[in-house]
Every structure is written in structure tokens, then in C-alpha cells.
Amino acid sequence: IPASIAGGASSSKQRYLHKLRYRVRSMGLAADISFTGQRDDLKNILAISNLVLSLSTQPESFGRTTLEALRLGVPTAGYDHGGVGEILHTIYPEGLLTFGDIDASTKRIATLLQQPSPVPDDDFYPLRNMLSQTLDLYEQLARAPRR
């Protein structure tokens, strides 16, 4: 199954990207895994995907890519931590992976590729609500007594 690793790497992550590319080549997977680099059309890449993976070892505060893929109706799997875990718990629990459990994660990913569960068609985390809640929080903090 061909795979794409979409997105660029910041200057602080160039060494990691180099190691990742080397590992792909050394495992003989260069014909199967492509690195897209920075793209302005990530939404299009997500939309044509059979499965989107969010496998950051560091918990993300929000998990925007996960939410974008799910909003496009694309099955998505990711580690059960940070924003990715919260989003998957709410929208697509079938995609939850236990961090560090490679065997179980591999089996879950294979199942999602062979028999994907449909992604619910709903407007989860609407932008208007998120902005309103964020502004409400800022207003509460601004009114709170200072210590």
C-alpha cells in the first residue's frame, strides 16, 4: 500500500527528517513511501487518502490534522494522547491506538485499511463554537482577580 508522509519539517526537525528518509530507504520502502514536503493542498491529500495516521510520539495540544481528516470523512488513527486522543475519543474511537503497543497498533491499522468503519457525518468542533469558547475563557481570565 503506497503511503505519503505529508508536510514539511521545521529547521529544528531536519535531522529527524533525514533519519526518517534514511530508514525508509534502508528498509527498501522508498518506492512505497513518498515524502511530499510542505504543501498548500494538504486538504486534497487528506481527502484522497484511505486512512490518515497521526503518530506523533509527543502529545499534540489540538490535533488539527486529525480533525480535518475526520471532517472529510477519512478514517483516521492516532495515539491516544493529547488532542488527537481527545478528538478520536469523541468522533472516531475506532482509530484510537495505544502509544507504545506496536503490535496492537499494526493490527488496528490493518483492520481500518481492510474494513474501515464509516466516519460519522457531523460538524464536530465547529469553528464558531471553538472561537466563542476561547474568547469566553479569555474574558473570564481578564476579569479574574490578580494574585
Predicted regions, residues:
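A charged, aromatic-enriched C-terminal amphipathic alpha-helix characteristic of glycosyltransferases
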Residues: 114-146
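Acidic donor-binding loop of glycosyltransferase active sites
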Residues: 47-61
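Active-site donor-binding acidic/aromatic loop of nucleotide-activated sugar
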Residues: 12-17, 30-39, 45
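Active-site donor-sugar recognition loop in glycosyltransferases
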Residues: 41, 57-61, 83
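Short hydrophobic beta-strand element within catalytic cores of glycosyltransferases
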Residues: 75-78
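Conserved acidic donor-binding segment of nucleotide-sugar-dependent glycosyltransferases
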Residues: 90-103, 111-114
